[in-house]
Amino acid sequence: MNIPDKPSLEGLEEKWSKLWKSSKIYNFELEQVSAKQDVYSIDTPPPTASGVLHIGHVFSYTHTDIIARFQRMQGKIVFYPMGWDDNGLPTERRVQNYFSVRCDPSLPYCQNLKLAQINNDSMARSISRRNFIELCQQLSEEDERKFEELWNYLGLSVDWSQTYRTIDDDAIHLSQHFFLENVNSGAAYQDWAPTLWDVTYRTAVAQAEIEERQITGFYYRLAFENENATVEIETTRPELLAGCVALVAHPDDNRYKHLFGSHVITPVFDVKVPVLPHRAAQPDKGSGIAMVCTFGDITDVQWWRDLNLQSCPIIDASGRVVPDAPDPIVSERGRRAFATLSGKTLSAAKKHTLEMLISEKSIIGEPRKITHPVKFFEKGDKPLEILLTRQWYIRNGYSDNALTERLIELGKQLQWYPKTMLRRYEGWLTGLNSDWLISRQRFLGVPFPIWYQTDDRGNAKFDDPIFPDRKDLPLDPTIAVPRGYSENQRGAPNGFVAETDVMDTWATSSLTPQLAGKYLKNPKLFEAIFPYSLRPQGQDIIRTWLFSSIIRSEYAHATAPWKSTAISGFILDPDRKKMSKSKGNAKTPKDILDRYGADAVRYWAACARLGVDTALDVENPTQIKIGRRLALKVLNAARFVVHLHKNKETYSGQPDMKRCYPIDFAAISNPLDLSLLKQLDQTIEQSTNALKNFDHSKALDTTETFFWNFCDNYVEIVKDRAYAGDESALTTLLVVTNIVIKLLAPFIPYATEEAWSWFNETSVHTQSWPETLKLHSGDIELLKIACSFMSLVRGGKTEAKLSQKTEIAYLKIALPNPEIIMPIMDDLRRAGKIDKCELIDGDAQILAIEYGEISR
């Protein structure tokens, strides 16, 4: 092994990642598993394969890799797969923008369609659904190759023979299999119900995909008339007036008790609607009486259900007013008014409705400006609407107390890191307002394996679904034909039609334990790794990925899919805002990795405590710079020890780390050396316990503190003795270097592998994790006082603006318990270049110092 005169970090990533991959040191070998306890399995988050990874991915995936490397060194057979989430809206949008295409399911498939990147919406071309899906797969595969390159450069110890995708045939087969299982058990069902709807994407949205944003709006006070009085209501959505089906007030509100059971007439549209009591009405909100529309918000849905109101939808899937007036509008005046709204966007409809209200003097006073929370699809830019639609659902405990209690119990059975994250899971579960909506009106996704019989006119009979035989999976019902039918019966009277909706991406991602573990293809593998040891993930998807995975596992296996879960925090920009691609403040990791190296970036990630948000200023990444300095110091320290042993006659050529075990304790006799090893024992124990509890930050800090003390103090103190060939010093240096490289290996794998290679031909990442030496001799206080001595001497020279090489003729120094360091005063005097030294018991300080040549 050629050891450079000046060690460098440049090129280590390419050198070692290639060797690791070719030697397959991270591959999971099922035949090596003799018992479940031998395995440590990780349900790795599959990153969304749409564009580029950002620095937040590097942050959280490093945390997982540290644990994987630690468990491997602990003797576990680690199952560490990698998946690609290439299914869903992000991929669709990327393909639309990249190729400038739009999917039109009515178009025929075009064979051998080849498109290049265009990025020009004005040139958008319509293509068939099948062609669109092929482009999605093509671009996803290109993105996945880039992702794999970055993960390899970062040093993830992933088993690249264990990869999966969320939209390939295996994923479709698995998702369809478990969907049919859920249908058979009653866990999955179809319903026509109010649905949260994104008008931009034209798809239903689940509760877990919603975020609230503060929006500026106005309260408008409208006048409704009854036979004896005017009733005033306040609303932020006058455009929904045509869909009003009732007014509601709290049953104890004396202002409106006399109206309960009566009717009022809506302004402009002249619809007669009832006034009803309901305890969800808020007397202190607005005028205290509310307009019920179908539907303005979730409360409207509650009132509609509880009061058994009629539905009067006026918004279509594109977010425009429907073409025909709803049935309750019967007056000629009302129908004429509605005709002027037909086809308008909601913002235009609001403006025009207000104009009509003003013209008939049904607006009272001036609008009142407010800021209020409005629900959005997390990927959308327009407020969500609520439409009556047919959708597929999976029961999640919303209306089943026994299931809720079971899911809470499964959550409590997990080891949560940090523990506080359990409260988020429980809070989400107890705050559900619907079952889990799993169908989407999109193009890319797992098809529902369903057809429907048609009636005499060719209309789908949704109450008569046709399900396939399990042996026919995977399938696309828009291409495949159900058994007993022929293709010419598709869409024909008394024939069949395919379900065109696809499954929500979480309906597939919720099955990553089964998908990565090849539940259908390799039962022995799945048996060996399930339940998984760990699910690492972000805190923002507890309500989606984690919760949905527990639901699916409970239905499939009656258990939680993992034993523990580790939740990472967010990466914040310098303004303390969460970095995300959607907000445009996310930084790609390539530049910073190229500039500082993978080990430095991993160090920065490891310094953050699990679950805690961490800020990053990419222009001045202080911790990353510190990490680079640490990695270089590891190389320089190892080089120093190697050369010491090469220069010793008893060693020929390359020192062998194996020589350290079993340790010849008889060779380690110096009190300072024994004190250092005692402190090393403490470091091993603390670092090991920290990593077992997923506290990588504490483990790194503990080891790093010991290492810098070793380099800055111990090495300087024993250097002369080591150069002189002292066996105690040389053995101690070799032992400590061995162990420190191992302790740092999970954090900075490249520098530690390089340093290890100078001593041994094996990989440090296949070595056993260090165990405490359990020394019976050695006083840990000795090293502490010796370090204090050296710190005072250095400080004195620095204060006098002298070189550290300046000799001291006489030193009088006070230290607590100075007699402890008397046996090593020769080492200390040589290290500090001191001729005469007088020790005094007291608080640590220099009492007198005279600089001058040492008498020789």
UniProtKB/Swiss-Prot annotation:
Family stated for the protein in its record: Belongs to the class-I aminoacyl-tRNA synthetase family. ValS type 2 subfamily.
Supply the EC number(s).
Answer: 6.1.1.9
Q: What is the UniProt domain comment for this protein?
A: ValRS has two distinct active sites: one for aminoacylation and one for editing. The misactivated threonine is translocated from the active site to the editing site.
Catalysed reactions, semicolon-separated: tRNA(Val) + L-valine + ATP = L-valyl-tRNA(Val) + AMP + diphosphate
Question: InterPro entries attached here?
Answer: aa-tRNA-synth_I_CS, aa-tRNA-synth_Ia, Anticodon_Ia_Val, M/V/L/I-tRNA-synth_anticd-bd, Rossmann-like_a/b/a_fold, tRNAsynth_Ia_anticodon-bd, Val/Leu/Ile-tRNA-synth_edit, Valine-tRNA_ligase_type_2
Question: What are the annotated GO cellular component locations?
Answer: cytosol
Residues binding ATP are: K581
- What domain of life? Bacteria
Q: Protein biosynthesis: is it a keyword of this entry?
A: yes
Q: Which organism is it from?
A: Tropheryma whipplei (strain Twist) (Whipple's bacillus)
Motif 'KMSKS' region located where?
578-582
Assembly, in brief, is: Monomer.
Q: Primary place of residence?
A: cytoplasm
Q: Which UniProt keywords apply?
A: Aminoacyl-tRNA synthetase, ATP-binding, Cytoplasm, Ligase, Nucleotide-binding, Protein biosynthesis
Record's protein name:
Valine--tRNA ligase
What Gene Ontology terms describe what this protein does at the molecular function level? aminoacyl-tRNA deacylase activity; ATP binding; valine-tRNA ligase activity
Q: What does this protein do?
A: Catalyzes the attachment of valine to tRNA(Val). As ValRS can inadvertently accommodate and process structurally similar amino acids such as threonine, to avoid such errors, it has a 'posttransfer' editing activity that hydrolyzes mischarged Thr-tRNA(Val) in a tRNA-dependent manner.
Q: Does the keyword Signal apply?
A: no
Return the motif ranges for 'HIGH' region: 47-57
Cellular compartment(s): Cytoplasm
Recorded hits in PANTHER family, A to Z, give: VALINE--TRNA LIGASE, CHLOROPLASTIC_MITOCHONDRIAL 2, VALYL-TRNA SYNTHETASES
GO terms for biological process, alphabetical: valyl-tRNA aminoacylation
